[in-house]
Amino acid sequence: MVAPTALKKSDVSEGTVPVTTTSRIVGVDNTEKIDEDDDDADVLIDQDGDAMLVDEENNEESNKKKEDAGVVLDAEGKPRFTSAASSAQTKVKLESRKVSVPPHRMTPLKNNWSKIYPPLVDHLKLQVRMNLKTKSVELRTHPKHTTDPGALQKGADFIKAFTLGFDLDDSIALLRLDDLYIETFEIKDVKTLQGDHLSRAIGRIAGKDGKTKFAIENATRTRIVLADSKIHILGGFTHIRMARESVVSLILGSPPGKVYGNLRTVASRLKERY
């Protein structure tokens, strides 16, 4: 007698056993037939590839979570940081800066103080005070109000420009424009001069009633301060270079007429550029 669990070949062919075409593994389509001649390695490779994709997605999610928590190293061992815009640290830390004021600039600072502190307080959101005991201007950021990380440096540059001898309006330009710089050099850096020779060099740079200095400023769109043997130039990078070349040529002994001719050429080039 045949065992009741055994099935005859004819029974299977006649369809007595139901055959399901859908797979019990959710998400994978197993309805396609695979030939017997096909290699099983291809199937294993595809499964490995799907597993690798899932692992990469999981790694990316874990890396994002780690980036939010702290520093994460990439495959090369370099740290990965989130962008500053997406980070929640928009507040500026409490920092302070002290700018010393020369004795000969204390009186102009006191007279113009009512015009100096409003740009720092209203525009840069800084806390400012003038310390008469130490003869300095103290700047401090406020964590609740200061939003620009470079506000403290801009304020210090503004006060420093005023203490060097620049006009108040020219110094305020440092707060409004980001591409302005101050370059300082001495006459002895160009040529070693002493006594009357040094005085004549300073006079050649200034000119009669300051005409030569004004001509250089207007042609190169800069501002120049002659503080004894020191020369301070305020302006853009290329403009400072043009003004410095004119001043250096005067120190080295070039005739003022030749310098004026070069300034005309420089002014025409600037007009064509802008």
From Swiss-Prot:
GO terms for molecular function: RNA binding. Residues 195-247 form the KH domain. InterPro entries: KH-I_PNO1_first (IPR055212), KH_dom_type_1_sf (IPR036612), KH_PNO1_2nd (IPR055211). Residues 1-39 are annotated as: Disordered. The keyword Transmembrane helix does not apply. Keywords: Cytoplasm, Nucleus, Ribosome biogenesis, RNA-binding. One of its GO terms (cellular component) is cytoplasm. It is found in: Cytoplasm; Nucleus, Nucleolus. GO terms for biological process: ribosome biogenesis. It holds the Pfam family KH_PNO1_2nd. CDD domains: KH-I_PNO1_rpt1, KH-I_PNO1_rpt2. Required for small ribosomal subunit (SSU) synthesis. Has a role in the processing of early nucleolar and late cytoplasmic pre-RNA species. Component of the small ribosomal subunit, ribosomal RNA processing complex (SSU RRP complex). Belongs to the PNO1 family. This is Pre-rRNA-processing protein PNO1. The gene is PNO1.
